[in-house]
């Protein structure tokens, strides 16, 4: 129906002049049908059609319409058709009618084939532009670049300056993506691609067939959805907006008149910057990019060593990390550890093309960007410059210039955000330890230690708790301070001050992310309001409990201060900020009703409470100018009433100021009145005077909008001037949130406060300890004791059947140490321990095909790294080392490794699980042997022994792994297991007297030569495996 309507319209446009009057009448009759049909122009706009439709701007490349403002979507369609009709009159005067007819037929054929999709606005643009091109082609042949429409020429200029970005450009109601960007976007967004030039520079041979760029488009209300999809696909996306309106273009004489609107980039987005730079309302916590960082990385490559220089910036929390470190060319554990901590999503580097292949394989999921900028004078003010080497300073400039592309460079100027990656006050857990112990997961799913500990109430508190977990404390005093604070919170939980504060924190959004967005000037009005409101709420809470704070917290004899200096310090700092903060005054300057409006333009226009805002003079003056124009429009209405002799006449609305007249009374209308639109019953008009005043009113409204936009930016700058104070306040609140979360953990049944020894001697002694992760999953976990001391049980060798609980046991010890050193209660009857300087693990069996490493190569590489990293205060978990190779080789490696450690002066605390019982033959007072207990029995028709796991640690060694029992549990047929049992017995008899085991013979030779354990291990590790 719609196609037929449009087809009839265009046929009438191409008719001879004597039919023009009839054509206009026919168009008017069809208007009502088209009003409905045009609402279905884009299937993606189904949900948004109910929203208020914005005013259409004039088409790029056309003259401005005679009416300054189109009242609504329905009326606009007819007006656009009338403009096409007027354009056709000019065309028929200068171009042969038959040629123009052919052009129209071609367009209609394309539409029938589904190759053109768009509104009458797009189509009128196309007719005008193509006919203009035809006219010029008649006069002379133009160059390819000159054949572009004014809009396409503007697109080309924008794209040439931003070749690394996908440009999403506003054109009227829609956003369009052109040329090569359109090819990519149409595939990702599943949008129809309109044929045209697919390259900006006409490098594609087929581009010569087209006069316009290929493009795809979507309604402006879908920008948020499509922008996030593009960014999730790993693209860097720039949004281009119109920076002027039709009215401003007409009245502003300071700029040269052009046929297109001025456009500029208003926002650039990537995975790491989306959360900070997006200007949409965010209704969920896990917005894209919240936890991602941007890296600037440089590498010095030598024959055997890579030296890394690193900057990392996390835009959501403002953290700036710097580091430099070395690794051997075949080892990337330090890089992987930093990736685990800092979670980069994009890396900028001057040497990306020179990255070693093995390193690039680790960055497969990241965006790599090669950049090398010249150092400019404006970049020279580097915070903490005295702590940086020359390579880091050069790399800082690259990061600064890169962030400037996103308008996020301001954070690099705040010295309080800087810190070195390796902090002496905490342990830097390695990536393999984090993975092997299931400390965290990328999606915060169940089955991790963080999932157990996380009872935080705020997003920024949650991030800080995760940082605490990955960085256990090294200072006993700092650990005890946290434990004391937890106890104090539990004892004070019933006080009105703490109870109210705890309830208030439940609804607080991500204030840390918001204050960083404010510093970038990227925040919506509603977001600013809620930032100030939430901060003011906490401030008012402290002010309301001033007496309690003075007596219980600030006083030296106060209950809080005597029990926990840490908790008292947090509360005191927050209280002092509350007394001096201007945040409540800034909140009063905001008009609450305006920021709750759905329309963003209304939010901005009404943002300031003018009675309270201290710089409202210009705004008030402009509002008076607008009121003056409206008064003149009402005066004009009185004249119109007299002309029409309708004393009760009123404007249709006070937006477009149209006069509605019944069609039966149209004959009495003055000839100079302009008909804007009509229906079957009425017609709407503008008088010459109202037309003039409406245009003036729009211009005044544009000036007001620009003025308030400037004032809003100044308001954000005013808030940002208190960035350090506000961030400190938020971080204090985050720290209290973490302590409150750990206090909730301490309430779990069977959890106890760990006790740290005053002596320097290392030990772990626990009664009835449990694995917190397995227990939390609903398993009835069997508790076990732990006893490891400096001179006895420093090395525990644990044997036992498969699935007997060996790995779970050693993991629970490491988990309890980490929990204790972040200041948490632990799952045990009691725990006494000393502070460990690291927790290292070698658990699991896996290969690394991408890096060309076998399972055993990975195992030995990690083992060598552990040997080089551990000290006498390190807790070391070794789970079945040697299982990645043959039994003989594995026996030898495991034995030599334990022999090496027990002879070392800096022997760490070791938990060693194995099926190689030869390890227990190592003689040393430091070593104790245990196994996981079980009972065994035989079933009928089964040659092998079936075991029942008791999961209890028992002194001594077990000589069988009972792997056939696991085969039964896995459902393997009994006949196969019986056969396997016979083979196992035969194999055992053959190997017991085998004196030709190569590696054992080498060990005997080494011992006979009285070599050291280190030399023994070195020989074994250098074997070709």
Swiss-Prot record:
Q: Where is this region: Mispair-binding domain?
A: 142-272
Composition skew (Acidic residues), residue ranges: 41-50
- Region named Disordered: 41-70, 127-146
What keywords sit in the KW lines? ATP-binding, DNA damage, DNA repair, DNA-binding, Nucleotide-binding, Nucleus
UniProt cross-references to SUPFAM superfamilies, sorted A to Z: DNA repair protein MutS, domain I, DNA repair protein MutS, domain II, DNA repair protein MutS, domain III, P-loop containing nucleoside triphosphate hydrolases
GO annotations of cellular component type: MutSbeta complex
At the top level, the lineage of the source is Eukaryota
Function noted in UniProt? Component of the post-replicative DNA mismatch repair system (MMR). Heterodimerizes with MSH2 to form MutS beta, which binds to DNA mismatches thereby initiating DNA repair. MSH3 provides substrate-binding and substrate specificity to the complex. When bound, the MutS beta heterodimer bends the DNA helix and shields approximately 20 base pairs. Acts mainly to repair insertion-deletion loops (IDLs) from 2 to 13 nucleotides in size, but can also repair base-base and single insertion-deletion mismatches that occur during replication.
Q: Which PANTHER family match?
A: DNA MISMATCH REPAIR PROTEIN MSH3, DNA MISMATCH REPAIR PROTEIN MUTS FAMILY MEMBER
Provide the family line: Belongs to the DNA mismatch repair MutS family. MSH3 subfamily.
Q: What is this protein called?
A: DNA mismatch repair protein MSH3
